């Protein structure tokens, strides 16, 4: 179980890592990979459904476009989060119990989301899939925010931002 004391102590460890200059610049592929997988999945599911269930071409096209557009939005959100995650020092990621818990929870949410989208694609085509995918995405986003937000992930982001500001100020002087 994660306590406030564990979070505070790990934030102090993170600040020490950041002060020593251990911030990494992750590769673009590391950030984009899961988002591209989600986007591809959201396009693939309605295509698969169109081969298994007879429907109009316009319904398939609508479902694919809706899934692709929503997948693109998710791609950018996931890439931003992954870039922040991979910018943390590697040693900190290996030893941090908070980051390990958050990472495992996000993997579960990822798998559940992919499964729900797959099942939803068989409930209806076209606009039904589009609205359903949006609804599922919004509900999952709220659940993730409620669950992960408890760990005050904002503290990690603040620590990284303060490091970036300090580096900019030191270059100006």
Swiss-Prot record:
Disulfide topology: none
**UniProt KW Nuclease keyword:** no
Report the subcellular localization. Cell inner membrane
Q: Which UniProt keywords apply?
A: Cell inner membrane, Cell membrane, Conjugation, Membrane, Plasmid
- Main location per the UniProt record: membrane
Which domain of life, per UniProt? Bacteria
* A single Gene Ontology CC term: plasma membrane
Q: What induces it?
A: The expression is positively controlled by the product of TraJ.
Name the NCBIfam families for this protein.
Answer: PRK13741.1
Q: What does this protein do?
A: Involved in surface exclusion.
Q: What name does the UniProt record give this protein? A: Protein TraS
């Amino acid at each position: 179980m994660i306590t406030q004391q564990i979070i505070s102590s790990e934030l102090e460890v993170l600040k020490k890592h950041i002060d020593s200059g251990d911030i990494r610049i992750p590769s673009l592929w590391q950030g984009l990979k899961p988002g591209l997988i989600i986007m591809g999945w959201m396009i693939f599911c309605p295509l698969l459904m169109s081969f298994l269930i007879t429907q109009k071409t316009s319904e398939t096209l609508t479902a694919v476009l809706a899934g692709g557009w929503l997948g693109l939005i998710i791609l950018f959100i996931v890439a931003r989060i992954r870039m922040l995650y991979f910018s943390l020092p590697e040693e900190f990621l290996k030893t941090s119990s908070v980051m390990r818990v958050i990472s495992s929870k996000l993997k579960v949410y990822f798998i559940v989301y992919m499964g729900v989208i797959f099942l939803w694609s068989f409930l209806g085509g076209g606009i039904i899939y589009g609205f359903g995918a949006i609804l599922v995405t919004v509900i999952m986003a709220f659940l993730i925010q409620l669950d992960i937000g408890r760990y005050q992930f904002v503290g990690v982001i603040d620590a990284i931002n303060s490091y970036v500001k300090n580096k900019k100020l030191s270059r100006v002087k």
